[in-house]
């Protein structure tokens, strides 16, 4: 599904990613865990095409997309939900969804029904402005917008930030359901140990722009590993 080899990226003259290698199989959920400033968001931005790599390659379903623009990656099955809620706050929930329908040229009535089946929380909110939604509701809307295009690979950047625990549990259930119903592949970056352990089949630790270790979800609670690689231990 996704093959990343020797990926490097920089902001100006400051290198951020230092040769990342990662292979993700179809239907796999892979987590990337690490401190702020270690390159998690930069890695996702480089994968989706918002930041041009300075070295290495990215392949999606056997196709080299290293130089492909972000919008084409989106149309070729790669979805991205950035940190901080990717919605239009001045528009209603329904109009936010309609933008995604138009972008992906899908039938509104059919896809809206499918969206509300997966995200029932949005049904009574369709006429509300995005700005009045809670942080959790905004995140669910951002996720729903992204999935309107039926991506095969979904990139999630810290989706639990600032969200109440009940909606975090709801998002976990939604994503687990999509794994079964759509065989969705996910690359998830997070600092929430419980969230990443609940969803990921394997977890990579990122440190100073490199993937330095791979662990199973049940190893995340090893205090020595957490302190050594992430600094989140007690």
Region roles according to the model:
Residues 48:
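Helix-to-loop junction immediately C-terminal to a conserved catalytic motif
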Residues 56-64, 76, 108-110, 117:
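Conserved ABC transporter NBD signature motif
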Residues 148-152:
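A short, proline-enriched helix->beta-strand linker immediately N-terminal to the Walker B motif
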Residues 129-133, 137:
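Conserved ABC ATPase signature
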Residues 154-158:
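Catalytic Walker B motif of ABC-type/P-loop ATPase nucleotide-binding domains
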Residues 64-84, 112, 124-127, 220-226:
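ABC ATPase NBD coupling module
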Residues 33-35:
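The feature captures the beta-strand-to-loop junction immediately N-terminal to the Walker
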């Amino acid at each position: 599904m996704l093959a990343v080899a020797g990926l490097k990226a920089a902001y100006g003259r400051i290198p951020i990613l230092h040769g990342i290698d990662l292979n993700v199989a179809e239907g796999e959920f892979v987590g990337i865990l690490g401190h702020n400033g270690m390159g998690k968001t930069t890695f996702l931005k480089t994968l989706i095409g918002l930041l041009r790599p300075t070295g290495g390659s990215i392949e999606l379903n056997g196709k080299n997309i290293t130089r492909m623009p972000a919008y084409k990656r989106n149309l070729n099955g790669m979805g991205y939900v950035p940190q901080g809620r990717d919605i239009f706050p001045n528009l209603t929930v329904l109009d936010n969804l309609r933008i995604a329908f138009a972008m992906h040229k899908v039938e509104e009535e059919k896809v809206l029904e499918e969206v509300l089946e997966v995200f029932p929380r949005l049904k009574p909110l369709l006429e509300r402005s995005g700005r009045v939604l809670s942080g959790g509701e905004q995140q669910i809307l951002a996720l729903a917008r992204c999935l309107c295009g039926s991506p095969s690979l979904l990139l999630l950047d810290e989706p639990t930030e600032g969200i109440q625990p009940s909606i975090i549990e709801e998002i976990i259930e939604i994503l687990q359901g999509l794994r079964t119903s759509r065989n969705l592949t996910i690359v998830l970056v997070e600092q929430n140990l419980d969230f990443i352990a609940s969803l990921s089949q394997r977890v990579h630790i990122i440190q100073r722009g490199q993937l330095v270790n791979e662990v199973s979800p049940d190893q995340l609670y090893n205090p020595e590993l957490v302190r050594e690689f992430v600094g989140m231990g007690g």
